Every structure is written in C-alpha cells, then in structure tokens.
Amino acid sequence: QWSLAIHGGAGVIERAELSPERDAAYRAGLQAALDAGSAVLARGGSALDAVQAAVQTMEDNPLFNAGRGAVFTAAGKNELDSAVMNGVDRTAGAVAGLTRTRHPIAAARAVMEQSPHVMLIGEGAESFAASVGLEQVEPSFFFTESRWQALLTALREAGQPLPARPAGAPPEPSTLGKAVPLASLNEAPLNERKFGTVGAVALDSQGRLAAGTSTGGMTAKRWGRVGDVPVIGAGTYASNADGCAVSATGSGEYFIRATVARDICQRTSTGMGVQAAADAEIADVGSIGGDGGVIVMGKDGAVAFSMNTSGMYRGEAGSGRPSRVAIYADEEASR
C-alpha cells in the first residue's frame, strides 16, 4: 500500500478571483504532479523518488512559486530554496539561494546523499549542484512576466526602487495592462508575498516515509531572506519513528518560530492522528500570527490537509483509490 499527497501553496484563494480556465490549469498542474509521483510508487519505487518526481513537476510549471515560476527578490533575481528528508534514517538535505539549478529539490537530495552536510547556501550550493551533474540554466530560465509584474507592483506599493529588467528576459509585452492570456501563465491571485511553495509527502510500499518542499520564497524579499522551506523541522520533516512526514506552506518566519513540521511529528509520535496533529499545529502557528497550511502523511498512509487560509492547492493519491485535487478550503480532498 502506497500513498502520496502534494501541495502547490496556500493563501488567499477565492473562487471569484480564479477564472474557470485558471482553476482548470491549476488542477491540471496538481494532477500532473500527482501522476508523476504515483507512477514511481505504483511500480514499487521509493518514497524519496516519488516526492522528488512530484516536486520537480511543479518546479517546471510556471503556475507555482518554485523553480520556473519563482517570485523575484527586491533586486530582481530569483533565489530558490528546497529541502528533502528521508523518514527511515532522518537524513536530510537542504539548499537556499540557488539561482542557476533547474531543480532545487534535486540539489537538496544531492546534499543529503552526496555530501556530509545538511544545508548548503548561495554560491557554494550552486557549485556543489553543478559538481554532481545537476542541470544548470541561465537565471533568465526562471523569468515569468507575471512574477516580474508582481514584483514591480510590490516595490511601487512599498516606495522602493525598481530594478532593471533581468538580462535574458523577453522584451516587455506590448499587451501589458490588458488581460494576460492563459498561455503566458501566471497572473495568479494567490498572495505570493507569503504563501507560494510546493511540496510532497509519500509512503511507499515498503513503509518508508519522505517529505520534500521547494519555493521561490516571497516577492520582494531582501538581504538574503530564507523562509521555513529549507529549515528542517520548520517547513519540511519526516520520521518513520514518529510515523509522520510533513511539508508546509505559509508565512515562513512564523513556521520557523513554531517549528511546525517537527511539532506535528512530535504529536503523532504520542499517538495523535495525523489530521488532529495537523489541525492542532495550524492552530498553534495561527495563535502567533502565522498563516498557511500543511500536508501530512501518516505511517499507515493516512493523509491530512490543514490550513487557516481560504485555500491551498493540494492533491492526494494512493494504491486502490482514485486521485483527487482541490483548491479551496471548503473542498474535500482527503479521505
């Protein structure tokens, strides 16, 4: 028996703001990620491979704030963070501030499996990723017009200077100010200043748990800001001993302070069910001002989704049950 759950970020997602076309595009993106991870698990593959496959699919989809759809820093750059954790032996890997590695989740896994370390950042992380053969791209690979316009809007609102358009970016479209066609992708209504992230948690047929998370961070971030995603125990955690794997999405500073992912696994280790543990932790992080959501996988394959936002892009699949995806908080997505 295997089980998989994914998320594509939590935040202010209202039906009135999401056109039928965009709704369908997000659901298709979630389904594609579920299909990628499920294919690994259905053929007896590992939870780690499934998590990586699902996350990489979302990293390549400009709809999501990870990899190709990453938001921009105040300086007009894309800085990518990711983490992965193996529940069997609690090994973990994380990267922060990547600018050229196509799949940050692959870099995080390489840190875990091919280095003596847990977290690498910036130029060193980039050099390491290249040295182990991970695909490198020009920074402009991550450019999307909608994220760029979101940055300019945020900087104007804050009264901050606007950076030059990045080298290698396509020329500014003449259609600006008009409705952007779906083909040009993301003018997402999600409040990406806090909530854009992708993640996956899995249980494989051998009972192994794993978790992985990837993000572009928050729009207009400054000073090398890093959120909860690559912080093991905050945005990402997995432990077979605790019977739990977690990937979070939300206001990263609060999720770090509340050690959200580790706390959920601490709760399940005492016998609490995954849904109760997730709900209790979201209530706790909410009590200090944090917004967002989590996906949790139990050792029996039970899936929990919990959020204190109006939506979270999410989905789940498992052996012997149909896959399903959901967007809004009031939609049923778990069993």
PLM regions and their residue ranges:
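Alpha/propeptide regions of enzymes that mature by internal proteolysis
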Residues: 1-335
